[in-house]
Amino acid sequence: MSRVVIHTANMIPGDWANMCQAVWRSPLLPLQSTTAPGPQQSPGGGVYGTGTRFKRDLLAYLNSYGRQKTGSLVNQLARFDFRAVRAALLASVPSKKKLETMDSQKETLWGWPAVRDILRHVPPRQHSKPSHIVAQVDSPLLAQTFCQSNH
């Protein structure tokens, strides 16, 4: 069994000491059986909110750091069954890709393009209470842009 724990802090003392942080943890993940589908067996890597998609995006995020730094962790996590996970991973990595060429079914999106894509796939709730979005943004400019948007 394994568990994924994700924190919102950057790995710098200023973030740990001076900012509010959040932690998300997965359910316990069993080793993947030989019959359990892996991310490569699902067209497009799965739907947001599924374990298949979460695993694909998490492994892509870790791979973005380079195989030398995170390859061992990627290999270990690839052995586990993520089907119990019901979450969408939203991470940020440096990228110079053009927005109009991005396709989340073919590759993991990062940062603001990922926010846009994930929110497009979240179905609206069918009741009268307003919905809430909780976000942590460490840039004053991005926080102002995001928090003042009515969309």
Model-flagged regions — what are they?
Residues 4-6:
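Conserved short internal alpha-helix adjacent to the catalytic or cofactor-binding core
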